[in-house]
Amino acid sequence: MQVVVPFAATEPKTRLADVLTPAERTAFARAMLADVLTAVVEAGHEPTVLATAPLDLETLDLEAAVRDAGSVAVDDRPLTEAVNARLPERGDGGDDGTHIDPVAVVMADLALATADALEALFSAAADVAVVPGRGAGTNALVVDHPEFRVDYHGASYLDHREIAHDVGATLETVDSFRLGTDIDEPADLVEVLVHGTETDRAPARLREFGFELERTDGRVTVARLEESRPK
Amino acid sequence: MQVVVPFAATEPKTRLADVLTPAERTAFARAMLADVLTAVVEAGHEPTVLATAPLDLETLDLEAAVRDAGSVAVDDRPLTEAVNARLPERGDGGDDGTHIDPVAVVMADLALATADALEALFSAAADVAVVPGRGAGTNALVVDHPEFRVDYHGASYLDHREIAHDVGATLETVDSFRLGTDIDEPADLVEVLVHGTETDRAPARLREFGFELERTDGRVTVARLEESRPK
């Protein structure tokens, strides 16, 4: 199985602009990418970062084993096109033209990803296995069908169900809070701090930036220490 | 295993007040409760609704087998106290004083609950198994320890981890998007319509009320047909 991790290498995570400077957003996005790559390698696979611009894995905070297992492919086309160019086609991977090598696509902002959660996805038996995020996004999927193609525009989880149906592919929805939580908006930062482990880079970055959990009566939010806020 | 489903029988789901009338909120909350009870029975258990006021299961839209398997216990105390009164104590369930019967607590607003997702929770081996929701809530848990007690006030998932640690109970976090999605706010209604099945009552109610998925370019939202809006 190939595991592709799409990554917006320039101006990532603009929806966090209210709480993070551009430099912080870049550092945070790279920390999440490093956590995702680590989880993929721990799950026994060699991830390919599908980056919109050149990226040197040496500049990420990665264990040597993860860095060595990873590679980068640059493709500046929109996400859907770049991913589709990586999906299996009939004849890939086997001389007889029938076997194809499945391709997994795991978004780089799944900061809560763990090897266990990824293994549950990677071991799904269907032609297409999808992990939906909130709002019918597609946070991760595995494609083991030569005709299935992605369409990340709009309600992609619903689209992917339809596309699978249209090409005669079986589809399984994989139930995971960890993989179903993509980190896009300020409210999502709570999840990084609540569920991240001590060795994860993304929560460490947030703490460096001065974020901490604020436990009020009704719920948990993140707060940024006054003196650490961007001026 | 006992399965307890806490249910606010009066004025439920006030955070949906912007989009649903009080009567609609009551009907929707009861539809979600019926879906949760059905999933519990499909998972092989007999649910007890822990209601804040008297509730007649005959008035819920339930299959006969589910209605027959269910029961109601009324407890008008705050959630934490009412649940703690139901948790196992040392000596429960066995003559020798060592065996206890585990108790599961599944919230009534987990509209996406399925038998599969519940079975994954119910089969957890730890003394305490917790399904967190967004914002560090506790959406469901199974307690198989005589000293563990819940505290739903505030960041309950974090509190429950601490409480388990303090009483020497092992804790497992169960990873489920379906059980991790509680339906509290208008934005959550999208998930009911995206992930509900054809036989589920909660999405059927929303459609009766005039809600439908609105698939714009960027994301999916729910929209309510103009003529169906409360005046």
UniProtKB/Swiss-Prot annotation, chains A, B:
The record, for Gene3D superfamilies, names: 6.10.140.50, Spore Coat Polysaccharide Biosynthesis Protein SpsA, Chain A (3.90.550.10)
Q: What is its EC number?
A: 2.7.7.68
Q: Give the UniProt keywords, A-Z.
A: GTP-binding, Nucleotide-binding, Nucleotidyltransferase, Transferase
Q: What class of enzyme is it?
A: transferase
Q: What InterPro entries does this protein map onto?
A: CofC, Nucleotide-diphossugar_trans
| Catalytic activity line of the entry | (2S)-2-phospholactate + GTP + H(+) = (2S)-lactyl-2-diphospho-5'-guanosine + diphosphate
One GO MF annotation is:
phospholactate guanylyltransferase activity
Pfam families for the chain? CofC
> Quick one: which pathway?
Cofactor biosynthesis; coenzyme F420 biosynthesis
Cited function: Guanylyltransferase that catalyzes the activation of (2S)-2-phospholactate (2-PL) as (2S)-lactyl-2-diphospho-5'-guanosine, via the condensation of 2-PL with GTP. It is involved in the biosynthesis of coenzyme F420, a hydride carrier cofactor.
UniProt record similarity statement: Belongs to the CofC family.
**Would you tell me the protein name for this molecule?**
2-phospho-L-lactate guanylyltransferase
User: Which organism is this protein's natural source?
Assistant: Haloterrigena turkmenica (strain ATCC 51198 / DSM 5511 / JCM 9101 / NCIMB 13204 / VKM B-1734 / 4k)
